[in-house]
Amino acid sequence: MIPRHFALLAGAALLTACASSGAPASLTRMGPEAARERARADSLRYPYTKADIDFMSGMIHHHAQAIQIAEWAPSRGASPALIRLTERIINAQTDEIRLMQTWLRDRNLEVPTPNPAGMPMKMNGMDHVMPMPGMLTDAQLRQLDAARGPEFDRLFLTFMIQHHRGAVTMVDTLLASNGAALDETVFKFAADVSVDQTTEIKRMLQMLLEGNTP
Protein backbone atom coordinates (compact mmCIF):
# COMPACT_ATOMS: atom_id res chain seq x y z
CA MET A 1 0.00 0.00 0.00
CA ILE A 2 1.29 3.47 -0.86
CA PRO A 3 1.72 5.66 2.27
CA ARG A 4 -0.98 8.32 2.52
CA HIS A 5 1.35 11.30 2.33
CA PHE A 6 3.10 9.95 -0.78
CA ALA A 7 -0.25 9.32 -2.45
CA LEU A 8 -1.42 12.83 -1.59
CA LEU A 9 1.74 14.44 -2.94
CA ALA A 10 1.46 12.40 -6.13
CA GLY A 11 -2.06 13.74 -6.48
CA ALA A 12 -0.73 17.29 -6.45
CA ALA A 13 0.41 16.92 -10.04
CA LEU A 14 -3.10 15.95 -11.09
CA LEU A 15 -4.59 18.84 -9.12
CA THR A 16 -2.20 21.30 -10.75
CA ALA A 17 -2.96 19.89 -14.19
CA CYS A 18 -6.67 20.28 -13.60
CA ALA A 19 -6.21 23.84 -12.40
CA SER A 20 -4.13 24.74 -15.45
CA SER A 21 -6.84 23.51 -17.82
CA GLY A 22 -8.86 26.61 -17.03
CA ALA A 23 -11.55 27.83 -14.65
CA PRO A 24 -15.08 26.42 -14.76
CA ALA A 25 -17.33 28.08 -17.32
CA SER A 26 -19.48 29.58 -14.56
CA LEU A 27 -16.42 31.42 -13.22
CA THR A 28 -15.13 32.57 -16.58
CA ARG A 29 -18.44 34.34 -17.23
CA MET A 30 -18.06 36.33 -14.01
CA GLY A 31 -16.00 39.45 -13.50
CA PRO A 32 -12.64 38.99 -11.72
CA GLU A 33 -13.87 40.13 -8.30
CA ALA A 34 -17.04 38.03 -8.46
CA ALA A 35 -14.99 35.01 -9.53
CA ARG A 36 -12.63 35.46 -6.58
CA GLU A 37 -15.53 35.70 -4.14
CA ARG A 38 -17.13 32.58 -5.64
CA ALA A 39 -13.86 30.67 -5.40
CA ARG A 40 -13.39 31.80 -1.78
CA ALA A 41 -16.93 30.72 -0.88
CA ASP A 42 -16.37 27.34 -2.53
CA SER A 43 -13.12 26.81 -0.60
CA LEU A 44 -14.87 27.41 2.73
CA ARG A 45 -16.94 24.26 2.18
CA TYR A 46 -13.91 22.02 2.72
CA PRO A 47 -13.39 20.60 6.24
CA TYR A 48 -10.24 21.49 8.12
CA THR A 49 -8.59 20.20 11.27
CA LYS A 50 -6.39 21.52 14.07
CA ALA A 51 -3.44 20.03 12.19
CA ASP A 52 -4.31 22.22 9.19
CA ILE A 53 -4.53 25.32 11.39
CA ASP A 54 -1.25 24.53 13.16
CA PHE A 55 0.46 23.94 9.82
CA MET A 56 -0.71 27.17 8.24
CA SER A 57 0.03 29.20 11.38
CA GLY A 58 3.40 27.58 11.99
CA MET A 59 4.56 27.90 8.40
CA ILE A 60 3.98 31.67 8.58
CA HIS A 61 6.69 31.88 11.25
CA HIS A 62 8.89 29.37 9.42
CA HIS A 63 8.74 31.45 6.24
CA ALA A 64 9.39 34.64 8.25
CA GLN A 65 12.80 33.37 9.34
CA ALA A 66 13.73 32.33 5.80
CA ILE A 67 12.86 35.84 4.58
CA GLN A 68 14.78 37.44 7.45
CA ILE A 69 18.08 35.72 6.69
CA ALA A 70 17.60 36.02 2.92
CA GLU A 71 17.35 39.79 3.34
CA TRP A 72 20.82 39.82 4.91
CA ALA A 73 22.54 38.69 1.71
CA PRO A 74 23.17 42.05 -0.04
CA SER A 75 24.76 43.65 3.04
CA ARG A 76 26.94 40.61 3.81
CA GLY A 77 28.83 40.56 0.52
CA ALA A 78 26.95 37.60 -0.92
CA SER A 79 27.73 36.48 -4.46
CA PRO A 80 25.42 37.42 -7.35
CA ALA A 81 24.29 33.78 -7.60
CA LEU A 82 23.30 33.70 -3.95
CA ILE A 83 21.54 37.06 -4.14
CA ARG A 84 19.45 35.76 -7.05
CA LEU A 85 18.50 32.75 -4.93
CA THR A 86 17.58 34.92 -1.94
CA GLU A 87 15.41 37.16 -4.12
CA ARG A 88 13.44 34.12 -5.30
CA ILE A 89 13.03 32.94 -1.72
CA ILE A 90 11.84 36.36 -0.52
CA ASN A 91 9.34 36.79 -3.35
CA ALA A 92 7.91 33.27 -3.17
CA GLN A 93 7.64 33.06 0.60
CA THR A 94 6.20 36.57 0.99
CA ASP A 95 3.39 35.56 -1.38
CA GLU A 96 2.89 32.31 0.51
CA ILE A 97 2.61 34.12 3.85
CA ARG A 98 -0.19 36.21 2.34
CA LEU A 99 -1.91 33.02 1.17
CA MET A 100 -1.72 31.47 4.65
CA GLN A 101 -2.94 34.65 6.33
CA THR A 102 -5.88 34.85 3.92
CA TRP A 103 -6.80 31.21 4.55
CA LEU A 104 -6.86 31.78 8.30
CA ARG A 105 -8.70 35.10 8.03
CA ASP A 106 -11.41 33.66 5.75
CA ARG A 107 -12.21 31.11 8.45
CA ASN A 108 -12.28 33.68 11.25
CA LEU A 109 -9.20 32.10 12.81
CA GLU A 110 -6.37 33.93 14.54
CA VAL A 111 -3.89 35.36 12.03
CA PRO A 112 -0.45 35.43 13.66
CA THR A 113 2.05 38.20 13.08
CA PRO A 114 5.08 36.60 11.36
CA ASN A 115 7.74 35.88 13.99
CA PRO A 116 11.18 34.78 12.69
CA ALA A 117 11.95 33.24 16.10
CA GLY A 118 9.13 30.70 15.92
CA MET A 119 5.55 30.17 17.07
CA PRO A 120 4.60 32.18 20.19
CA MET A 121 2.85 30.10 22.83
CA LYS A 122 2.08 30.09 26.54
CA MET A 123 3.40 27.49 28.98
CA ASN A 124 2.58 27.66 32.68
CA GLY A 125 1.22 31.15 32.15
CA MET A 126 4.47 32.41 30.62
CA ASP A 127 5.20 33.44 27.03
CA HIS A 128 7.51 31.17 25.07
CA VAL A 129 8.53 30.79 21.44
CA MET A 130 8.50 27.33 19.90
CA PRO A 131 10.87 26.98 16.92
CA MET A 132 9.59 25.04 13.92
CA PRO A 133 11.53 22.08 12.44
CA GLY A 134 14.70 23.19 10.68
CA MET A 135 14.65 26.75 11.97
CA LEU A 136 18.01 28.26 12.83
CA THR A 137 19.07 28.42 16.46
CA ASP A 138 20.17 31.67 18.06
CA ALA A 139 23.79 30.52 17.76
CA GLN A 140 23.38 29.77 14.04
CA LEU A 141 21.74 33.15 13.46
CA ARG A 142 24.65 34.93 15.17
CA GLN A 143 27.15 32.91 13.15
CA LEU A 144 25.43 33.76 9.86
CA ASP A 145 24.95 37.40 10.83
CA ALA A 146 28.69 37.79 11.46
CA ALA A 147 29.80 36.06 8.25
CA ARG A 148 30.86 37.94 5.13
CA GLY A 149 31.54 37.11 1.49
CA PRO A 150 32.15 33.46 0.56
CA GLU A 151 31.75 32.38 4.20
CA PHE A 152 28.28 33.95 4.29
CA ASP A 153 27.41 32.14 1.05
CA ARG A 154 28.54 28.79 2.46
CA LEU A 155 26.74 29.20 5.77
CA PHE A 156 23.59 30.55 4.15
CA LEU A 157 23.33 27.57 1.81
CA THR A 158 24.06 25.12 4.64
CA PHE A 159 21.50 26.66 6.96
CA MET A 160 18.83 27.20 4.29
CA ILE A 161 19.10 23.54 3.29
CA GLN A 162 18.46 22.70 6.95
CA HIS A 163 15.55 25.18 6.98
CA HIS A 164 13.98 23.78 3.81
CA ARG A 165 14.28 20.21 5.08
CA GLY A 166 12.40 21.32 8.17
CA ALA A 167 9.59 22.69 6.00
CA VAL A 168 9.35 19.36 4.17
CA THR A 169 9.17 17.62 7.56
CA MET A 170 6.27 19.91 8.51
CA VAL A 171 4.45 18.88 5.33
CA ASP A 172 5.06 15.19 6.06
CA THR A 173 3.71 15.66 9.59
CA LEU A 174 0.60 17.38 8.25
CA LEU A 175 -0.12 14.70 5.66
CA ALA A 176 0.37 11.95 8.23
CA SER A 177 -2.28 13.53 10.49
CA ASN A 178 -5.69 11.86 10.41
CA GLY A 179 -8.21 13.91 8.42
CA ALA A 180 -5.75 16.69 7.60
CA ALA A 181 -5.15 18.34 4.21
CA LEU A 182 -8.66 17.65 2.91
CA ASP A 183 -9.04 21.38 2.36
CA GLU A 184 -8.01 22.03 -1.25
CA THR A 185 -5.97 25.15 -0.47
CA VAL A 186 -4.08 23.49 2.37
CA PHE A 187 -3.38 20.38 0.32
CA LYS A 188 -2.15 22.24 -2.76
CA PHE A 189 -0.04 24.64 -0.70
CA ALA A 190 1.52 21.81 1.30
CA ALA A 191 2.29 19.88 -1.87
CA ASP A 192 3.82 22.98 -3.46
CA VAL A 193 6.02 23.55 -0.40
CA SER A 194 7.26 19.96 -0.48
CA VAL A 195 7.98 19.94 -4.21
CA ASP A 196 9.40 23.47 -4.49
CA GLN A 197 11.64 23.28 -1.43
CA THR A 198 12.91 19.82 -2.32
CA THR A 199 13.89 21.24 -5.71
CA GLU A 200 15.62 24.21 -4.06
CA ILE A 201 17.50 21.87 -1.70
CA LYS A 202 18.97 20.09 -4.73
CA ARG A 203 19.90 23.43 -6.28
CA MET A 204 21.59 24.63 -3.09
CA LEU A 205 23.50 21.36 -2.66
CA GLN A 206 24.79 21.81 -6.21
CA MET A 207 25.80 25.42 -5.44
CA LEU A 208 27.76 24.20 -2.42
CA LEU A 209 29.44 21.51 -4.52
CA GLU A 210 30.43 24.03 -7.18
CA GLY A 211 31.64 26.60 -4.69
CA ASN A 212 28.60 28.82 -5.41
CA THR A 213 29.91 30.06 -8.75
CA PRO A 214 27.39 32.06 -10.87
Where are these regions (language model features)?
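Bacterial N-terminal signal peptides that target proteins for export
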Residues: 1-8
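C-terminal motif of bacterial Sec signal peptides marking the signal peptidase cleavage site
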Residues: 15-17
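All-alpha RGS (Regulator of G-protein Signaling) helical domain and cognate RGS-like helical scaffolds
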Residues: 20-214
